[in-house]
Amino acid sequence: ANGSIKIYGENPEEAKKKIGYIPQKNLINWNFPLTVRQVVEMGLIGKNTLNPFSKKNTQAVEESINQVGLKNEIDKNVNNLSGGQLQRVFIARTLTQGSEILLLDEAFSAVDVGAQEDLMEIINDIKLDGKTILIATHDINNIEEKFDEVICLNRHCCAFGDSSEVLTQEVMEEMYGSHNSMFLNHTPGNHGDNDGS
């Protein structure tokens, strides 16, 4: 296969400053003694600004932290935060960068249900601001409720479309194999629950 990719009409190299990446929690060394404010300020590094810590940029950092609901934790060490709070810190960092596209890698892993709901509320608010949210996940539970559109990948694109329609049995077999009945029981509105009837 061959072709080209454009992001907002630009080549990926030119558009990379418009993309903010939120990594998996377990890929980060949390032993560094950094506060929430300091991590979010890292979003200013590399921006076209002569003074990254000007009053204007400091205000942008604080606004991003407020937007994700961490105002009271702004000076707290990040290694004392919960998994959901850590995800919110990195979302705030990408907002400070001015990213137009947010790419979240396994955003809901090691995060309890309540924290997942908080994250989805924040993500939906960001989406309303006109930003694009891409989330990589292996968890298909409640996928129709969380996402507008889904792309299913297994070495190639198995399916792409509306989240309420794309997860057919044929697509699930292509992604996970016909032997994996846990996934094959999934249909829109059915998350694998079985009461034995």
Regions found by a protein language model. Name each.
Residues E41, K55-E73:
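Conserved ABC ATPase "signature" region
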Residues T137-H138:
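H-loop/switch region of ABC-family ATPase nucleotide-binding domains
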Residues N2-A15:
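Conserved ABC transporter NBD signature motif
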Residues N77-L81, Q85:
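Conserved ABC ATPase signature
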Residues T168-E170, E174-S197:
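ABC ATPase nucleotide-binding domains
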Residues L102-E106:
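Catalytic Walker B motif of ABC-type/P-loop ATPase nucleotide-binding domains
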Residues V150-S163:
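H-loop (His-switch) and adjacent beta-strand-loop-beta switch element
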